[in-house]
């Protein structure tokens, strides 16, 4: 009863903040994202009747507190679905920096859900596995189905699940990651956004935003898709930063990258910025222009990586297990 899985993190296109049901992690509205590769999380999980307690390790460190509670929510749900009560040994490793705004919880919980479901002997489709991953992170649901994916809002697992959007953009997109160090806490951001006086205004337009994004992505419209993602980043930030704590999570280098992107665009380069929760920046462009864009972002004084569109979460061979 052991399995290993791999999943890619996500960049939000139409993002979400705020949870209608925190236990089931049901969001207030739909969301759309794209997976970024080769960045990934790998997880090995084994249900073992000889263990006295669950063991959770991420990047070589034992997980405790709220992090352990979130993993346990996924583990316990899999136990319930499989009708087993064995304790689990769980180990995960990330190939990219975590907690700086690049979707590590998405890839982590997506890989965890895939590995746990396989280790428990369950036969589930990826949309079904996405409902398991959602118990740890809504973004993880979209990382399970990969590529450009749409998590639909709903009242339960029958309808709140992820589906992939087929698009020609998967071959064209290149993402330059501008890494701006600044620890972030997504759960706090959910609470801040929902308490903002601007949250109702965001809810009023988000459904039209989702419909427009789906149409642009399905039609392979690069500029329309990522202009929308850029605007949505600003909308999300405005909502989150006007919560009770007045939390400003951007750093000076974040703004510098924004301005550099707009200068490139004024020079007819197809390029748009996007941010989730954190100071780091996704800079979306095409294969033709990626070298020029990366050089410009690096000139802002940050480390960079270049990513492509990542596929769905998948089971790996036993030879790749972490233990």
Residue ranges and their predicted role:
Residues 6-7, 35, 177-181, 274-276:
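Short beta-strand segments
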């Amino acid at each position: 009863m052991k399995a290993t899985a791999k999943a890619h993190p996500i960049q939000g296109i139409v993002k979400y903040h705020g949870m209608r049901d925190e236990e089931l992690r049901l969001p207030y509205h739909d969301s759309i994202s794209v997976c970024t590769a080769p960045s990934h999380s790998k997880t090995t999980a084994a249900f073992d009747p000889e263990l006295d307690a669950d063991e959770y390790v991420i990047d070589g460190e034992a997980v405790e507190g709220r992090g352990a509670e979130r993993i346990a929510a996924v583990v316990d749900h899999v136990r319930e679905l499989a009708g087993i009560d064995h304790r689990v040994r769980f180990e995960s490793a990330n190939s990219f920096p975590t907690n700086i705004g690049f979707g590590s919880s998405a890839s982590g919980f997506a890989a965890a859900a895939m590995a746990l479901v396989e280790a428990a002997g369950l036969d589930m489709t990826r949309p079904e596995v996405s409902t398991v991953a959602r118990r740890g992170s809504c973004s993880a649901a979209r990382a399970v189905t990969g590529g450009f994916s749409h998590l639909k809002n709903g009242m339960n697992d029958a309808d709140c699940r992820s589906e992939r959007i087929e698009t020609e953009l998967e071959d064209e997109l290149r993402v330059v990651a501008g890494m701006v160090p600044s620890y972030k806490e997504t759960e706090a951001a959910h609470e801040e956004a929902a308490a903002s006086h601007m949250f109702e205004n965001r809810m009023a337009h988000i459904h039209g935003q989702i419909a427009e994004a789906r149409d642009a992505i399905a039609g392979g419209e690069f500029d329309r898709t990522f202009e929308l993602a850029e605007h949505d980043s600003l909308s999300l930030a405005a909502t989150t930063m006007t919560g009770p704590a007045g939390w400003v999570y951007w750093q000076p280098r974040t703004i510098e990258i924004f301005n550099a992107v707009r200068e490139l665009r004024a020079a007819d380069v197809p390029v748009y910025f996007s941010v989730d929760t954190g100071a780091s920046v996704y800079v979306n462009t095409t294969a033709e222009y990626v070298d020029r864009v990366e050089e410009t972002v690096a000139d802002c004084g940050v480390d960079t990586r270049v990513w492509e569109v990542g596929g769905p979460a998948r089971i790996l061979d036993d030879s790749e297990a972490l233990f």
